[in-house]
C-alpha cells in the first residue's frame, strides 16, 4: 500500500538524512502516497472547521518530519493566509544550523528549544500586521529578503517550569485510539500499550554527562526540577 508506512514513524529513513534536504524535497514534489491522501483529507476537514490563523507542528523525531512538511505544503497551497510554525526535538537537534531557504517554502517560522515563549511571540507576529523586521522573536528562524535569518532579539526570559501550566487533553479522542505494540520486546509495552498521561517532572537532565547526548543544548543542560506539590496539583487537575 505504502512503502514508507510505519505505525509511529512514517518515512523515517528520509527524515534521518538531515544533513541534506534534497531527498525530502524530491519526495515532497512527487505524487501523493496513499497515506498522504487520507492524512490531507483529515487536515482539510479540521482547517475548514477551525479556520486558524496559525498552525504549529511539533516534530520530535525523524519519523514525524515528512508528514509535517507534507501537511505544511498542503496548507501553503490551499490556505496561503495561514502562517505555519515548526518546533520540537528534531529541529532542536538537527536544524540548529539551518541555511536552506527552500525549507521556508513550507514553514514561516522554525523555533528552537523551550517552546512556550518562542510560540507566544510567533503567535503575536502571525496575528499582527507588524513588519517581520520590527517583530520580537525568541530563538526563531525566519526568511527575510530570501535569506534565512536566526532572530533572538527579545529581552523576555523563558517561562519557568512552575508557570507553564497543566496540559489540556480535553479534545484528545482517547476512546478512539487503539493500542499498538510494534515489536515483541515486553519492555516496549510499558510505554506504548494502553493510555498514559505523561507529565514533565523536570526540565533538562540532572546528570548531564552521557557522551551519546548533546548536553550543550539548553533544553538538556539547564536542569530545573518541578516540586512535588505542583506535580500533584497537575495530576489532580488532569
Where are each of the predicted segments found?
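Radical SAM [4Fe-4S] cluster-binding motif and immediate context
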Residues: 167-238
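Glycine-rich beta-alpha loop elements in corrinoid/cobalamin-binding modules
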Residues: 12-160
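Non-catalytic, alpha-helical, charged scaffold/linker segments
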Residues: 1-3
Amino acid at each position: 500500500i505504502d512503502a514508507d508506512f510505519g505505525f509511529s514513524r512514517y518515512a523515517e529513513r528520509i527524515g534521518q538524512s538531515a544533513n541534506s534536504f534534497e531527498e525530502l524535497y524530491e519526495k515532497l514534489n512527487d505524487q501523493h502516497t496513499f497515506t498522504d491522501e487520507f492524512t490531507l483529507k483529515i487536515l482539510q476537514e479540521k482547517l475548514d472547521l477551525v479556520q486558524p490563523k496559525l498552525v504549529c507542528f511539533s516534530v520530535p523525531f525523524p519519523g514525524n518530519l515528512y508528514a509535517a512538511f507534507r501537511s505544511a505544503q498542503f496548507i501553503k497551497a490551499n490556505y496561503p493566509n495561514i502562517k505555519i510554525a515548526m518546533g520540537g526535538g528534531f529541529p532542536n537537534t538537527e536544524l540548529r544550523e539551518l541555511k536552506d531557504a527552500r525549507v521556508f517554502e513550507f514553514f514561516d517560522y522554525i523555533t528552537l528549544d523551550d517552546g512556550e515563549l518562542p510560540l507566544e511571540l510567533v503567535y503575536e507576529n502571525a496575528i499582527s500586521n507588524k513588519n517581520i523586521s520590527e517583530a520580537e522573536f525568541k530563538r526563531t528562524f525566519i526568511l527575510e529578503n530570501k535569506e534565512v535569518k536566526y532572530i533572538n532579539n527579545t529581552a523576555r526570559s523563558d517561562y519557568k517550569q512552575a508557570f507553564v501550566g497543566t496540559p489540556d487533553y480535553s479534545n484528545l479522542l482517547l476512546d478512539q485510539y487503539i493500542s499498538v505494540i510494534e515489536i515483541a520486546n515486553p519492555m516496549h509495552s510499558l510505554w506504548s500499550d494502553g493510555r498514559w498521561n505523561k507529565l514533565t517532572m523536570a526540565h533538562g537532565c540532572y546528570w548531564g554527562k552521557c557522551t551519546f547526548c548533546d548536553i550543550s543544548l539548553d533544553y538538556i543542560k539547564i536542569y530545573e526540577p518541578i516540586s512535588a506539590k505542583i506535580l500533584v496539583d497537575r495530576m489532580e487537575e488532569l
